[in-house]
């Protein structure tokens, strides 16, 4: 019986240490690395970086603002507000005009918008756990969209190693506020890269 208690104690201690290390920010006052376009190189060879392009569209900024508002609702564990903002994001995505982009960019943007719209619709109809599952994929879509449209704002790609094997999202603030765990683990994550 004593051996079982010691084993359970050791397992609990190991789990606590893993959780603590995994969620540690790791930021030692080092500035975030500037993000160039490496992660989109295979699809965006004609782009030098994610800075604002000639194809900048005000509606792309509206989509970003809706995304950030949705992120903030998830950070605040506000299911009702997230539903409302998911619906608002659906409308912004549907009104996005791709006509000023090259044929290749139009094709990519149409795919991104279709996928992002589906996830925003799920968010507008779901409980918070399901909203967060769809926000993970929505975040990838929005990041891919920014690689094409550019942005006027400085953005931070943040990363939580704990949620679903590791998950990234975009933020306007360098300070990490985790939309996947909300108040449960608000500060879990780190700035992975700086955009623009």
Enumerate the predicted regions with their spans.
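Post-signal peptide N-terminal segment of mature Sec-exported envelope proteins
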Residues: 32-55
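Bacterial N-terminal signal peptides that target proteins for export
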Residues: 2-12
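C-terminal motif of bacterial Sec signal peptides marking the signal peptidase cleavage site
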Residues: 19-22
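Bacterial signal peptide processing site
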Residues: 24-27
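Mature extracytoplasmic or organellar-lumen-exposed domains after removal of signal/transit peptides
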Residues: 54-196
